[in-house]
Amino acid sequence: GEPEVAKWAEGLREKAASN
């Protein structure tokens, strides 16, 4: 697991939750 990927995935979840 890479921190960059984890941060990217977290960003997608936040954006998806926002929509």
Curated annotation (Swiss-Prot):
The mature peptide does not contain cysteine residue. The modification Asparagine amide is found at N19. The keyword Transferase does not apply. Conantokins inhibit N-methyl-D-aspartate (NMDA) receptors. This toxin has the highest potency for the NR2B/GRIN2B subunit. It induces sleep in 10-day-old mice when injected intracranially, and hyperactivity in 24-day-old mice. This is Conantokin-Pr3. It is found in: Secreted. The modification 4-hydroxyproline is found at P3. Expressed by the venom duct. Belongs to the conotoxin B superfamily. A divalent metal cation binds at E10, E14. Keywords: Amidation, Calcium, Gamma-carboxyglutamic acid, Hydroxylation, Ion channel impairing toxin, Ionotropic glutamate receptor inhibitor, Magnesium, Metal-binding, Neurotoxin, Postsynaptic neurotoxin, Secreted, Toxin. InterPro entries: Conantokin_CS. One of its GO terms (cellular component) is extracellular region. The keyword Calcium applies. The modification 4-carboxyglutamate is found at E4, E10, E14. GO terms for molecular function: ion channel regulator activity; metal ion binding; toxin activity. It comes from Conus parius (Cone snail).
